[in-house]
């Protein structure tokens, strides 16, 4: 078996180039490819073949890691479309979103400072629901509208949301210990 190391991850796994994917089919394709390219299958072959199998296995695992998570999958789709989401440099967000983030952060900090585990758990649930809504908007922007600038902004929003979810998790862990 030979893997084209130049093909995109969607092609590698036989998936359509879309944000909405069948995650079970992705996992099944990953397991199938892993079985074909696993370095143990090439242990008896010359070093050049062993190295090639390591490259293939690395490519398969990296592709799965990227496509498995919605946020990295969206970033990858933007990259394939030639859109720079400017994740590291463009943090400009709408005033409404920034105000919303400030409110979320204040609520988390107040609950943390007061030691209110129940309130933090409620905030986590509300934020998870909000994240689902934003993901749905991202799917619409990428798959239905092909609106890459909106998708790039939504990716940046999701990064804020994901970071806040981790902060809530950390606060809960600190309070429960």
UniProtKB/Swiss-Prot annotation:
UniProt keyword annotations, A-Z: Chaperone
Pfam families: HSCB_C
Coiled-coil ranges per UniProt: none
Annotated GO biological process: [2Fe-2S] cluster assembly; protein complex oligomerization; protein folding
Gene Ontology terms, MF aspect: ATPase activator activity; protein-folding chaperone binding
Superkingdom to which the source organism belongs: Bacteria
Domain (J): residue spans on this chain: 8-80
InterPro entries: HscB, HscB_C_sf, HscB_oligo_C, J_dom_sf
Subunit: Interacts with HscA and stimulates its ATPase activity.
Similarity comment text for this entry: Belongs to the HscB family.
Its biological purpose: Co-chaperone involved in the maturation of iron-sulfur cluster-containing proteins. Seems to help targeting proteins to be folded toward HscA.
Protein name: Co-chaperone protein HscB homolog
Organism expressing this protein natively: Azoarcus sp. (strain BH72)
